[in-house]
Amino acid sequence: DKNRIANDPAFQRTRENGSEFGRAGKGGKVIRNAIRVLLQNAKDKRVVSRLTKILVAVTKTDAVNERGLRTIEDGDMNTLLGFEFNINGKLGATLFAPYATAYDRVAGSVDLDIAAFAPTVRIAAPNGTTHFKIVMGASELDFANEASVFESSETAILPYNGADTAPIDLSVALTANSVLPVVQVAGVEFYQEVNGQMYPLKNGAFNALSVV
């Protein structure tokens, strides 16, 4: 029963796991709230549970705190690299243009650079796509206080054709000398032009967003 799980020494491991799972769940909410502006355009129905699962894995890499007290921020945040927020439109299966990311913790600057590329060659777009844009965001995550700072940048809506884009350089500024964990995300959003109006393609079902 509940009381026994809460107090019986035999359930010590269960309590420790539950404590860390709860922390991972709250941490997932911090991340989702932080990047909400971009996440609302690119997510699947299971993103909450998938994100919690990988944050449990991050927690397990914490070599500082004892079991049951391990935290996300003391774990290896690189475990999150490549996490896809929409399994129906993975960035890794969408954007094939080489890109470079950079984070200068002293200055607080976060960058995404993509050399000029031909969209129809380097982007695997869903049927019906006429236009797209590249988005990038970065967030300082204060898990202990369930707070965050978020900034984002994006290209204009660009034509999906065979002509090379201009080089893309997206940059945002976070707090200089921050001691908090920082997560950077990048994505592609698809559009369909109808009578001069831009509409999110299939309500964003195939938009991509990933931790980079």
Locations of regions flagged by a protein language model:
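Long, polar/Ser/Thr-enriched low-complexity segments
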Residues: 1-89
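Short, low-complexity, polar/charged sequence segments that are solvent-exposed and flexible
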Residues: 14-15, 47-49, 131-135, 155-157, ...
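Charged linear interaction tracts used for macromolecular binding and regulation
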Residues: 59-203
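Low-complexity, polybasic segments enriched for Lys interleaved with small residues
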Residues: 200-212
